[in-house]
Amino acid sequence: MMNSRMIQKKHNKKKVYDGKNISVNIHNVSFRKKKFKREIVEQKSASAVLAFDGKGNVLLVRQHRFPHGFVFEIPAGTLGKNENPRVCAIREFIEETGYKPKKLKHLINYYPFIGYNTQKIHCYVAQDIEKVSEIKLEYDEFLTLVKMDFKKLLKMIVSGKIVDSKTICAALTYANSKKV
């Protein structure tokens, strides 16, 4: 049961930055008769796909992510305006891999930065994929498609070699559901 005395009340907000991928607002809030400010990053939500090729491998992309360097991650992308997360997942998966999932099941949603960011990640699992096109990248994307044994992916997560949060959440949620 939610207690209304535990909720911070928003009075107003001021936009202090408006960029291509994020905007930053300062919210004036009160809680227990005290006033303070909250810095909130508004960011588009995204969809991601943990996809299996039918041979125990997952499809990952390896790309350079400034400022962190090269990373392995599951295919993903931001939702367009009013875009359904499932539609976004399929679109991004085709663009980044050239494959289309015949079966796509919702896996988990999560907020990667719950205390100060509005972004929500929608994760799906794909089985029974088929090659439908070549990879279609944005002007600022460069990636390599990598097929990796799922158990190797899990070992790389545990060893700290996979550091991408959506990949970690999707893989561990899936592994737990299948008792891998």
Residue ranges and their predicted role:
Residues 5-7, 41-43, 47-91:
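Conserved Nudix-box catalytic region and its N-terminal flanking loop in Nudix hydrolases
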